[in-house]
Amino acid sequence: MKNTIKKGNQVLVLSGNSKGQIGEVLVIDRKRKQLVVKGINQKTKHMKPKRQGEVGQIIRREYPIHMSQVRLWNG
């Protein structure tokens, strides 16, 4: 029986900097076999001001990881 990962499931990260962490699936891209997990694979992006008078920002967001790097967590 194959366990399919769905939006809202808890997954365990098997490799990378976040190895051993558990998070909730936010977005799934089945065509690219990638998913976005809450709190996992976060990167910092520096945004320049686009208009005069605007202030630049530093944004932290989750980026997708490959499905082979996670396993469904039943905890």
UniProtKB/Swiss-Prot annotation:
Its main location: plastid. The keyword Chloroplast applies. GO terms for biological process: translation. CDD domains: KOW_RPL26. Gene3D superfamilies: 2.30.30.30. GO terms for cellular component: chloroplast; ribonucleoprotein complex; ribosome. The keyword Plastid applies. One of its GO terms (molecular function) is rRNA binding. HAMAP family: Ribosomal_uL24_B. One of two assembly initiator proteins, it binds directly to the 5'-end of the 23S rRNA, where it nucleates assembly of the 50S subunit. Belongs to the universal ribosomal protein uL24 family. Part of the 50S ribosomal subunit. This is Large ribosomal subunit protein uL24c. It comes from Cyanidioschyzon merolae (strain NIES-3377 / 10D).
